[in-house]
Amino acid sequence: MLKSSVPLLNQFKYIVGPSKYGIYPLLPPSSASTSYPPPRYVPETIARPDYVPKNFFTSGWGEHDSVEIPEAQAQRIEMGGEGERRVREVAKMAREVLNDIGRLVRPGVTTNELDKALHEMIISKGAYPSPLGYSSFPRSCTTSVNNVIAHGIPDERPLNPEDIINIDLTLYFNGYHGDTSATFILSEVDKPGRDLVEATKEALEIGIKACGPGKRYKDIGGEIEDFARRHGFSVNGQFSGHGIGKIFHHPPWIFHLRNNDVGKMRPGDCFTIEPCLVQGSNSRGELWDDGWTMATESGARSAQFEHQVLITEDGVDVLTRI
């Protein structure tokens, strides 16, 4: 069980977001952290991805070994083989954890408490939380609240009843990664916020419908952008989906805007679709001093949903839908 942090709410200043986008707390750049406690414990019996520094769990913050992440080449899953079985298994595990952590989202709970609970869920499955130690990322998931587009770092800020929060998580198990995310609505979110979240969820489904053997990657972005614009939202172009399997991030890069990608999908292609929709016409984000958190320039809210998909001989399977 998570310990409620409702009494802490008064310790955090409520900064009102731009009124034209609704009623919600704005997260300012000054709330960024630049140092962190030691990473959460992971048993040595659990396999870790190669990018995790050898001394990540034993050295102080900023003292970790530098691990170069080489530029990855596109990979395909061998259909009908052990690789397909493993990637399906870990993707399902990721969705199970997301569903479970979503039930714990409520006012007063801190994102750090959510991260701790999620970490324990993943470890209990014998899996590793892929973000932990990736380029020395300090937590096991990302939590992006209101005007934060992506890569928010879990901290001690309690959730407010007017918040929306995206939780993005990835598991590493049996040599493969499973990646998914969702945006959750708290109890007092206004209609503009709810409309944004629902539109983003639908935009993901529209992107999935553009997938299949022989279909063009660029059509995913075209369909998503057209849908978003029709509903009065913009799409952030600073983040993309990505190929995934044995490697956390590799080509193809899945753009959620109109683009000129000439690639076509083939059976065995495994990748994520993860559009970030933003209120208003300015979708640009600015990076906070923590080097990770990206928040909207305009102060508008952003929402994101993500699925991991696998192209098959006759269509597309959504591996993180259960």
Task: Identify the function of each model-found stretch.
Residues 2-322:
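Active-site neighborhoods and metal-handling regions in enzymes and metal-associated proteins
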